[in-house]
């Protein structure tokens, strides 16, 4: 596969991952109610996200409430907000950088500089994936830990929501896409070639007697 094809494929994966990350950030399904007691007929399901919580009735009616106070939120929710939004914005910057250095655009003249710009964009995309992975894993760790904590009431136990799985998939796409962009750009950067200077000396003219020609002497 050519370097330009690698860049395009990587950019497509990064764009899909970026959309998935935005979707995961906005969905109120980071944790959902866990049904552990099958003898109890539940009339509603609770979803919780970074920006709102929703209650879904058994009839299908859903009512959501936006978090009004930032200070009242838990530390993991505040950190997840900051890191996820930061990853989304950084991915936007990475998009402009990658498009500037991509081989399919003419923003920069073709050459090593253009390839290094694309290489920077791919590295930024990979960094976005890692940045988004931190709050996702942190949040999931807290949900799992509270789920197995015997001191937490059954009614307050939650399971991993769909937004976490979408976020993990988006992070993987961002890192894989960024890696492909870097691979495609690395081919075009050009590797430095090292060579040793070769000195040539003019041949000496000699006479039949093996001495220098007398006309060389004054």
UniProtKB/Swiss-Prot annotation:
Q: Which GO terms describe its biological process?
A: bicellular tight junction assembly; calcium-independent cell-cell adhesion via plasma membrane cell-adhesion molecules; cell adhesion; cell-cell junction assembly; establishment of blood-retinal barrier; establishment of endothelial barrier; maintenance of blood-brain barrier; myelination
One GO term in the molecular function aspect is: structural molecule activity
Q: Which family does it belong to?
A: Belongs to the claudin family.
Q: Which residues cross the membrane?
A: 8-28, 82-102, 124-144, 161-181
Provide the function of this protein: Plays a major role in tight junction-specific obliteration of the intercellular space.
Topological region Extracellular? 29-81, 145-160
Q: Which residues lie on this side of the membrane: Cytoplasmic?
A: 1-7, 103-123, 182-218
List keywords of the entry alphabetically. Cell junction, Cell membrane, Membrane, Tight junction, Transmembrane, Transmembrane helix
> What is the membrane topology noted in the UniProt record heading this document?
Multi-pass membrane protein
What Gene Ontology terms describe where this protein resides (cellular component)? apicolateral plasma membrane; bicellular tight junction; cell-cell junction; cortical actin cytoskeleton; lateral plasma membrane; paranode region of axon; plasma membrane; Schmidt-Lanterman incisure
Identification of the protein by name:
Claudin-5
Q: How does it assemble?
A: Directly interacts with TJP1/ZO-1, TJP2/ZO-2 and TJP3/ZO-3. Interacts with MPDZ.
Q: Where in the cell is it found?
A: Cell junction, Tight junction; Cell membrane
Q: Which domain of life is it from?
A: Eukaryota
Q: Where is this region: Interactions with TJP1, TJP2 and TJP3?
A: 217-218
**Biological source species:** Rattus norvegicus
- Per the record, the gene is Cldn5
Annotated InterPro entries: Claudin, Claudin5, Claudin_CS, PMP22/EMP/MP20/Claudin
């Amino acid at each position: 596969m050519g370097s330009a094809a690698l860049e395009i494929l990587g950019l497509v994966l990064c764009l899909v991952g970026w959309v998935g990350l935005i979707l995961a950030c906005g969905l109120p399904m980071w944790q959902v109610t866990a049904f552990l007691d099958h003898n109890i007929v539940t009339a509603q399901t609770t979803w919780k996200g970074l920006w709102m919580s929703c209650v879904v009735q058994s009839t299908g009616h859903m009512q959501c409430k936006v978090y009004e106070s930032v200070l009242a939120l838990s530390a993991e929710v505040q950190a997840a907000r900051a890191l996820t939004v930061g990853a989304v914005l950084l991915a936007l910057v990475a998009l402009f950088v990658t498009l500037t250095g991509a081989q399919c655009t003419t923003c920069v003249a073709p050459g090593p500089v253009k390839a290094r710009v694309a290489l920077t964009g791919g590295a930024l995309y990979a960094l976005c994936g890692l940045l988004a992975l931190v709050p996702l894993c942190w949040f999931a760790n807290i949900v799992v830990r509270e789920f197995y904590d015997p001191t937490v009431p059954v009614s307050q136990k939650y399971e991993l929501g769909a937004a976490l799985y979408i976020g993990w998939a988006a992070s993987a796409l961002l890192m894989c896409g960024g890696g492909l962009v870097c691979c495609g750009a690395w081919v075009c950067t050009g590797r430095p070639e090292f060579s040793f200077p070769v000195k040539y000396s003019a041949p000496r003219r000699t006479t039949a007697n093996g001495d220098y020609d007398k006309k060389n002497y004054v």
